[in-house]
Curated annotation (Swiss-Prot):
Its cofactor is heme. InterPro entries: Cyt_P450, Cyt_P450_CS, Cyt_P450_E_grp-I, Cyt_P450_sf. It is an enzyme of class 1 (oxidoreductase). Coiled coil: none annotated. Gene3D superfamilies: Cytochrome P450. This is Probable cytochrome P450 514A2. Heme binds at residue 446. It is a single-pass membrane protein. Keywords: Heme, Iron, Membrane, Metal-binding, Monooxygenase, Oxidoreductase, Transmembrane, Transmembrane helix. Its EC number is 1.14.-.-. PANTHER family: CYTOCHROME P450 514A1-RELATED, HEME-BINDING MONOOXYGENASE FAMILY. Pfam families: p450. The chain crosses the membrane at residues 4-24.
Length: 500
C-alpha cells in the first residue's frame, strides 16, 4: 500500500513540476513556433486531449480545414507542426529543406527500433539499410522475374477455384484476406527466399496484421509518459507484443539457417548462384559480417519490410477491387484496353515494362493511390535545423507530420470533384505523377514503391483479362475502410466469372 501511495505522490509532483514549467517558462522551440496558427491549448496536455485516438488522420485533417496548410499542435511536451498540400510537402521534403527533414522523429513506443530498423533508424545507418532494399527492387530486376508476380497471381486464381479448370465461376470469400495472403507469399520469397506451407503463412498473416493495426494506435504516453496506464488496455487488446515476438522468433530461426550457408560464411559473393535472386535476408547478413549493421537490424528491418509491404499493398489493391466490383462499366473499359494490347493472347506473361501501353489502367492506379491513400498520416519526421515554410518559422527539433490523406482528398488541391473516384483526372498522366505523395516524399520515401507498382499493374492485367467480377450481394460493397496507420479494407466477397 505504501508503494502505491509513493507512486501516486510521485506522479502528482511530476504533474505539478510540468504545470509550472508549462505556465511560466517558454523554451526555444515553443518561442520560435508560437506564431504558427494553432488550436487553443491547455496546460500540460496541450492539444493532446483534442485528438480522436480512433481516427487521428481525420482529426488532423479537420484541424487543417480550420487552421490552414501549416498549423501547430502541442502534443503534451512535443512541439508538432502538420503540413498539408502537395506543393508545401514537395518543397520541404524534396527541394528546399530536403537535408533538414531526413530524420525520423522516434516516439517512445517506437524506441525499440531506434537506430536499429529500417523504419526508425536515422542518418547513414538508415540509408545503408534502405539502399540494400532499393537495389533489389529495381524495375530491371522486377521485369526479369525477380519476384515471379505472374506465377503467384495465377496460382491464387487456381486455388480460389479449387484448381477446377472446367469451372466458369467461383465465389471468393473475404477478398482482402486472399490478397494479403498472396502478397505475403511474394514478400517471403523476396525477403527470405522461401515458400511456406499454408499453416505458417496463416500464422504470419494473422500476427502481421495484429502488429500493423497496433502500429496505428494513438499512444498518449508517446507525449506524456505518465499517461502510460491509459495505453495499457488498448495495447494489450491488440496482441501487439505477442504477435511481434512470434514474427521475430520465426525470422530468427530463418536467420540461423542463413548462417549455415557455406558460401556466405566463406565470403564468396555469389556462391555459384544468381545474385539477382539473392534473398534480402542474405544481403543484410553480409552487411552484418562486414560489421556495417547490427544483428538485430537484420531481424527488425525484415519485420518492418514484411509487415509494411504486405499491409499497404494489399489494402490498396483490395480497395480498388471492391470499387470495380461495384462498377462493371470500369471493368469493361479495362478489359477493352487489355484486349487491344493482347493480339497474340499473351498477356498472362505481362511485364511492368509494358505499362505505358495501358494508360487507362495507369489512370486507375493513380486514382487509387489518391482516393484510397494507403498511409493517411505517415510516421513523423523531425527538423534538424530551423526552417521557414509558407512564411512561418519552424524550430529545430519540431515533430513534423505530413497530412497525406487530407492533401489527396481536399477540394483546395483537387477541385470540387475531389471526393469522387474519377480515373479520368489522370488520363494523360504517367504513373506516380507529381502531387500524389502516396509513397511519401524526400529521402524517407517508401523504398518499396516499385514493388507495389509492378505488382499492382500485373494483378490488374491478369485479373481483368481472365475474370469479370460481380457483387454476390444486393447492397454495394463498403469501400470506405477503417483508419489506422494504414487504411484497412473491410472484408467482402466477390463472384469471379471466367472470361472466354
Amino acid at each position: 500500500m505504501n508503494l502505491i501511495y509513493t507512486i501516486i505522490l510521485t506522479i502528482i509532483i511530476l504533474v505539478l513540476i510540468i504545470s509550472i514549467k508549462d505556465l511560466f517558462f517558454e523554451d526555444k522551440i515553443k518561442k520560435i513556433n508560437k506564431s504558427i496558427p494553432s488550436p487553443p491549448t491547455i496546460p500540460i496536455f496541450g492539444n493532446l486531449l483534442q485528438i480522436n485516438s480512433k481516427d487521428v488522420a481525420t482529426c488532423f485533417n479537420d484541424f487543417y480545414k480550420q487552421y490552414g496548410k501549416v498549423y501547430r499542435l502541442r502534443l503534451g511536451s512535443v512541439e508538432t507542426v502538420v503540413l498539408t498540400g502537395g506543393d508545401i510537402i514537395d518543397e520541404c521534403f524534396n527541394k528546399k529543406y530536403r537535408d533538414f527533414l531526413k530524420a525520423r522523429y522516434v516516439k517512445f513506443s517506437r524506441y525499440l527500433g531506434k537506430d536499429t530498423n529500417i523504419l526508425h533508424s536515422n542518418g547513414d545507418y538508415h540509408f545503408l539499410l534502405k539502399g540494400v532494399l532499393s537495389s533489389q527492387v529495381t524495375v530491371r530486376k522486377l521485369n526479369n522475374g525477380r519476384l515471379e508476380f505472374n506465377k503467384y497471381i495465377l496460382q491464387m486464381f487456381n486455388n480460389l477455384n479449387n484448381n477446377d479448370e472446367g469451372s466458369t465461376m467461383f465465389l471468393a470469400n473475404d477478398v482482402p484476406s486472399q490478397i494479403k495472403k498472396l502478397i505475403l507469399k511474394v514478400v517471403l520469397n523476396f525477403t527470405l527466399g522461401i515458400e511456406e506451407n499454408d499453416d505458417i503463412n496463416l500464422s504470419l498473416f494473422q500476427n502481421g496484421s495484429n502488429i500493423f493495426k497496433a502500429a496505428g494506435l494513438f499512444i498518449y504516453s508517446d507525449y506524456l509518459p505518465f499517461l502510460f496506464p491509459l495505453d495499457i488496455k488498448s495495447m494489450a487488446k491488440s496482441n501487439m507484443i505477442s504477435s511481434y515476438v512470434f514474427v521475430r522468433d520465426y525470422l530468427a530461426k530463418k536467420l540461423e539457417e542463413v548462417k549455415k550457408k557455406e558460401y556466405i560464411i566463406n565470403g564468396d559473393d555469389d556462391g555459384g548462384v544468381d545474385t539477382s535472386q539473392t534473398p534480402l535476408i542474405e544481403s543484410y547478413y553480409k552487411l552484418y559480417l562486414q560489421g556495417l549493421i547490427g544483428y538485430d537490424s537484420i531481424l527488425l528491418s525484415i519485420v518492418d519490410i514484411i509487415i509494411a509491404s504486405v499491409d499497404t499493398t494489399s489494402n490498396s489493391i483490395s480497395f480498388i477491387i471492391a470499387r470495380l466490383t461495384n462498377h462493371q462499366e470500369i471493368q469493361s473499359k479495362i478489359y477493352e484496353e487489355i484486349m487491344s494490347n493482347d493480339i497474340n493472347n499473351n498477356s498472362n506473361n505481362i511485364s511492368f515494362s509494358d505499362h505505358s501501353k495501358y494508360p487507362y489502367i495507369i489512370s486507375i492506379m493513380n486514382e487509387t493511390y489518391r482516393y484510397y491513400a494507403s498511409v493517411p498520416l505517415p510516421e513523423p519526421n523531425m527538423t534538424t535545423e530551423d526552417i521557414e515554410v509558407d512564411g512561418y518559422k519552424i524550430a529545430k527539433g519540431t515533430q513534423i507530420y505530413k497530412n497525406i490523406r487530407g492533401t489527396l482528398i481536399s477540394k483546395e488541391f483537387w477541385g470540387e470533384d475531389a471526393l469522387e473516384f474519377k480515373p479520368e483526372r489522370f488520363k494523360t498522366q504517367t504513373l506516380n505523377q507529381k502531387g500524389l505523395l502516396h509513397f511519401g516524399a524526400g529521402p524517407r520515401g517508401c523504398p518499396g514503391a516499385r514493388f507495389t507498382e509492378c505488382f499492382f499493374f500485373t494483378l490488374m492485367v491478369l485479373l481483368f483479362k481472365n475474370y469479370k467480377l460481380q457483387n454476390p450481394n444486393d447492397n454495394p460493397i463498403d469501400d470506405r475502410g477503417d483508419v489506422g496507420l494504414s487504411m484497412q479494407c473491410k472484408p467482402y466477397d466477390a463472384l469471379f466469372i471466367k472470361r472466354n
